[in-house]
Amino acid sequence: MDIVILEPADWRVFKAIRLEALRLEPRAFGSTYQFEAEQTAAFFRQRLTNNTVFALWEPGQSGKSGAARGVLGIGPFKGPQEKHKAFLWGMYIQADLRGSGLGSELLQTALDVAAKQVEQVLLTVTASNTAALSFYRRAGFEEYGKEPRALKVADSGYEAEILMVKVLT
């Protein structure tokens, strides 16, 4: 398995893994499958242009191009007094790879790249996602707050989000 940075030309790969994540883990993300499934190629190209998106890449067999098996994005803050920060978003690893260490490798690769440009990385994780909370704590992220009712999940209520940060330098 390789870790690659997706380019705007890879928008179809990104869209496929992103839609899978939204379909299988709807309570974990601020967006929805329905919303992103309706978006154009330009939407996904823009996400790849404005962020650094890393993918766990499984090379294909017999000349096939391969597939993304996991993904995460890191986007910079834009304000002049916030350029020392980035936001980690959209982390998803296919179920059969969870617990294999590949998610940790993906995250660490992203943090190593981010450390060359920013001093700290922030993220949010739904309070009910205890596996993700444990994963980020093991990676050195610390909680600094909680936003109640952060996500309103259609027909199933609200999700609180835990705010986390990792200082890189």
What are these regions (language model features)?
Residues 1-3:
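Extreme N-terminal starter segment of soluble prokaryotic enzymes
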Residues 9, 39, 79, 83, ...:
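Residues at secondary-structure transition points
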Residues 67, 116, 159:
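Structured loop/turn residues at beta-strand edges in well-structured enzyme cores
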Residues 105-120, 142:
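Conserved acyl-CoA
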Residues 119-130, 138-169:
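C-terminal "cap" of GNAT-fold acetyltransferases
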